[in-house]
Swiss-Prot record:
Domain ATP-grasp: 9-237
Binding-site positions, Mg(2+): N192, D206
PROSITE patterns: ATP_GRASP, SUCCINYL_COA_LIG_3
Name of the featured protein: Succinate--CoA ligase [ADP-forming] subunit beta
Listed Gene3D superfamilies: ATP-grasp fold, A domain, ATP-grasp fold, B domain, Succinyl-CoA synthetase domains
Residues binding ATP, per UniProt: K45, G52, R53, G54, I94, E99
HAMAP family registered for this protein in UniProt: Succ_CoA_beta
Family in the record: Belongs to the succinate/malate CoA ligase beta subunit family.
Cofactor binding note from Swiss-Prot or TrEMBL: Binds 1 Mg(2+) ion per subunit.
InterPro entries named in the record: ATP-grasp, ATP-grasp_succ-CoA_synth-type, ATP_grasp_subdomain_1, Succ-CoA_synthase_bsu_CS, SUCC_ACL_C, Succ_CoA_ligase-like_bsu, Succinyl-CoA_synth-like
Gene from which the chain derives: sucC
Alphabetized UniProt keyword annotations: ATP-binding, Ligase, Magnesium, Metal-binding, Nucleotide-binding, Tricarboxylic acid cycle
Function, in words: Succinyl-CoA synthetase functions in the citric acid cycle (TCA), coupling the hydrolysis of succinyl-CoA to the synthesis of either ATP or GTP and thus represents the only step of substrate-level phosphorylation in the TCA. The beta subunit provides nucleotide specificity of the enzyme and binds the substrate succinate, while the binding sites for coenzyme A and phosphate are found in the alpha subunit.
């Protein structure tokens, strides 16, 4: 789950990371009020989940509250890469001498939280990694003790912050960012840029936090911050139904119960020369309504040329899955071929229910994948 910049900066501020003064506005009048409270030059920034806001005209400076109101009226309602701007962040505009990148991310190779810093701040870190990887300094936090003081200092020295006061403040900010990352169950937390001001102090100008959806049950306050404006309708509907769905680029829709089985199913589809259109896990104990919703989500993708069901009934009853498939087909008019491999609890009843339908039966996963690939290729 992505957070807007203003939401991320509020979290950073709670951990003692210095951020610029300001607030979020939904109307030009609110933007003017915030600018009056700041009492100086401000920057008005569109709050949308896309990059390149500045180039699209979504970030503008204002010297007076009146200008802030005018600029906000121009940005609010603007369409940036398909997203409508509904909120703007009005923040203090400051001068600075240097931009730094600082971020925390899970590194699956080392199975550690890795803190990254770069002297090349203000640009996408992926671009720095591609063009000048030597400019990125990394340290892996200890899995039990977290980010240690000497590691935070190593980051500072690694990007050229040799002044003792600056290095100490940077280390404090890095440690605070790590704590925030861990406490909110984030998958990414970054400050870009973290700037060095004329007096040598550091301040966070822009920030980004992405939360791990699997940890949101521990954070109802953060879940309440969700903005689904950039979330595809199918994924939003799946989330609300308790279905794990990720759209892919292939043409074979897959409905499976269990994440491991779903990944194995996709592998076998690839083995037989096909391309999965999605990852979809209906979970354990799915009833017919959930199955119906899942099938409707799969069929909402116009690229789907065949649908493959791979259900292993343990907690999930095969007959309930079969009822859900039939119920969905009664509501969705489609000629997409469907292949079903259903085994486990009440499988005989499930097969009986499907026997009168147009579904193509399969006894094994390999057979189901092969038939699905053939069906998709024939269309």
């Amino acid at each position: 789950m992505k957070l807007h910049e203003y939401q991320a900066r509020d979290i950073l501020a709670r951990y003692g990371i210095p951020v610029t003064g300001g607030g979020v506005a939904t109307t030009p009048a609110e933007a003017r009020t915030i600018a009056e409270q700041i009492g100086g030059r401000v920057v008005v920034k569109a709050q949308v989940f896309v990059g390149g806001r500045g180039k699209a005209g979504g970030v503008k400076l204002a010297d007076t509250p009146e200008q802030a109101e005018q600029v906000a009226s121009q940005i609010l309602g603007m369409n940036i890469k398909g997203l409508t701007v509904e909120k703007v962040l009005v923040a203090e505009a400051i001068t600075y001498e240097r931009e730094i990148y600082l971020g925390a991310i899970m590194d699956r190779a080392s199975r550690r939280i890795v803190m990254m810093a770069s002297a090349e701040g203000g640009v996408e870190i992926e671009e720095v990694a591609r063009t000048n990887p030597e400019a990125i300094v990394k340290v892996a936090a200890h899995p039990m003790m977290g980010l240690l003081d000497f590691q935070a200092r190593d980051l500072a020295y690694g990007i050229g912050l040799t002044d003792g006061r600056q290095a100490r403040q940077f280390a404090q900010i890095a440690t605070a960012l790590y704590r925030a990352y861990m406490d909110v169950d984030a998958s990414l937390a970054e400050i870009n840029p973290l700037v060095v001001r004329a007096d040598g102090s550091l301040q966070a100008l822009d920030s980004k936090i992405v939360l791990d959806d699997s940890g949101l049950f521990r954070h109802p306050d953060l879940e309440a911050m969700r903005d689904s404006s950039d979330e595809p309708e199918a994924e939003q509907r799946a989330r609300e139904a308790g279905i794990t769905y990720i759209k892919l680029d292939g043409n074979i829709g897959c409905m499976v119960n269990g994440a491991g089985l779903a990944m194995a199913t996709m592998d076998v589809v690839k083995l037989y020369g096909g391309e999965p259109a999605n990852f979809l896990d209906i979970g354990g104990g799915a009833g017919k309504e959930k199955v119906k919703t899942a099938l409707q989500i799969i069929l909402s993708d116009p690229n789907v040329k065949a649908v493959m069901f791979n259900i292993f009934g343990g907690i999930t009853r095969v007959d309930e899955v079969a009822k859900g498939i039939i119920a969905a087909l009664e509501e969705v008019n489609t000629d997409v071929p469907m292949i079903a491999r259903l085994v486990g609890t009440n499988e005989e009843e499930g097969r009986r229910i499907l026997a009168e339908s147009a579904l193509i039966p399969a006894a094994t996963l390999a057979e189901a994948a092969e038939k699905a690939v053939q069906a998709a290729q024939s269309r």
